[in-house]
């Protein structure tokens, strides 16, 4: 058999060519858009290169599911970064929300949460994310007011800014967002009155939770136009009439208004047949308990304690299944499970 001896110099040249070809093949096969990768690496830098993002490496593909919290659009096969989860980052010192987020124009979902060292206001750069549907900034020390510029992101479906250090007043302009389904602003320092415009959210809007803030004034009469499945305005300083939140023609499932100074005749409100949770404790609500409560077969949570209610607790439904504490400390409420009326 004839043998061929390849010179050493030729063998070395072939090895170099092979390495180059493999490198070119790898580069060509990378799905991550180079602009998206550059933006992500800048975000990492702007946050002080936290060790939690150690998987974000310039030599790897950001769309191969090895980059923590990063997902790309595989449905349309554009492979643009459309989902970013920045939760639980161990930032080495306080940092603001990076304005470089604006360089991810295809983001549909942005979650920023559980970061004690995240501080400062919500940056105007967020308004450039014109395809954003879901925006979560929660359990951080982000401060300042909820910005008006959010009304520019017409695609927004969900806004969750719960448990931060946000202050100022509620921005009236977000009620113009045509696709907004719900807002969650619990656990901040938001003050002032609820804007009248919040009664003009679109028919898609079904959830409003703004508990544990410093809201004052009255619930706008325009809320009669809303059909909320979930409403939680508890632990504020609201006063006056909250009957506009009730109605037999609504699809309301939960109403939580505890620990305010609300005063209205509970006996005159209509009740949604879907109501499963009602927390009205620690207010100034008067009148009687509506007979309609006995017809609510889904009602599993009720607390009307520490109000000015009177009369006999209606018999039937689930009302006698609740503990005495659910009815305690009213003006003259009586009947099972409280002592009998005299």
Curated annotation (Swiss-Prot):
Domain of life: Eukaryota
Posttranslational mods: Asn-303 is not glycosylated.
Keyword Cell membrane among record annotations: no
LRR repeats by residue range: 82-107, 108-132, 133-156, 157-180, 181-205, 206-228, 229-252, 253-275, 276-299, 300-319
GO BP term (any one): defense response
SUPFAM superfamilies referenced in this protein's UniProt entry, alphabetically: L domain-like
PANTHER family linked: POLYGALACTURONASE INHIBITOR, POLYGALACTURONASE INHIBITOR 1
Family to which the UniProt record says this protein belongs: Belongs to the polygalacturonase-inhibiting protein family.
Role played: Inhibitor of fungal polygalacturonase. It is an important factor for plant resistance to phytopathogenic fungi. Inhibits all polygalacturonases (PG) tested, with the exception of PG from F.oxysporum which was only inhibited at 60%.
Protein name, as recorded: Polygalacturonase inhibitor 2
Organism: Phaseolus vulgaris (Kidney bean)
Lineage of producing organism: Eukaryota, Viridiplantae, Streptophyta, Embryophyta, Tracheophyta
Gene designation per UniProt: PGIP2
